[in-house]
């Protein structure tokens, strides 16, 4: 699943007229770069959530000969199905539940932010998933203002911290921040489809449904709230290089980065 519904406010004025997913880097939209990466790793199906300029994303998808928008429509093409959030942006956790009909029954599915470019070998990442993992998060030891905290022996998620504000969230009183590994999240993660039932229960018990069938919540809040009950692991890639194409001044950096892949 590709998270592509964001407003892209940090990329204004480009996103005044087009969605972040269609912002070009080296002549290709971010959406195309992400889908190409998935396809090269053997993924033949994807789900894309849309909100900001949703019509433009759908028009772009429909115009790609190598993409099919309906199951069974074109052998050898990549099936890309759209999860529609036009009415309301559901945040990342709500987006996953909203796309449930496309995701359940698949065993595991990968989540990839559309604005992340990386050298991550997705085949390698999928091979790191443990049988008992509800989710597996790609992380690395790099400078960031926000860190996920992991048990050093198990790499199980046990907390989060914001170094700028001093905010700290721990899985319980047994967790000691100073004993944890502090690693930065990459915006790429893998979920077991069992997460869908857990997410639904989480959203209902916390009153996160804004209508009878529409939940809205961030996926990281879900991870941090449930990591004391479920195995949510980090996978650290020592040679991971990535660019978050979230601001105008990162576009040039992203173009240079693509030349190194």
Regions found by a protein language model. Give the residues of each.
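Catalytic-core segments of class I nucleotidyltransferases/pyrophosphorylases
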Residues: 110, 117, 123-130, 142-143, ...
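Conserved beta-strand termini and adjacent loop/short-helix elements that scaffold enzyme active sites
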Residues: 83-85, 138, 235-238
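A short, conserved acidic/glycine-rich loop-to-beta-strand motif
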Residues: 132-141, 146
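A generic "binding-loop/recognition-motif" signal
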Residues: 7, 18, 53, 86, ...
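Short beta-strand-to-turn element immediately C-terminal to the catalytic PLP-Schiff-base lysine
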Residues: 25, 149-152, 245
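Glycine-rich N-terminal loop/short-helix segment of MobA-like nucleotidyltransferase
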Residues: 1-26, 37-41, 236
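Conserved beta-strand segments of alpha/beta enzyme cores
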Residues: 21, 79-81, 231-233
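Conserved N-terminal catalytic core of the sugar/cofactor nucleotidyltransferase
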Residues: 2, 24, 28-113, 124, ...
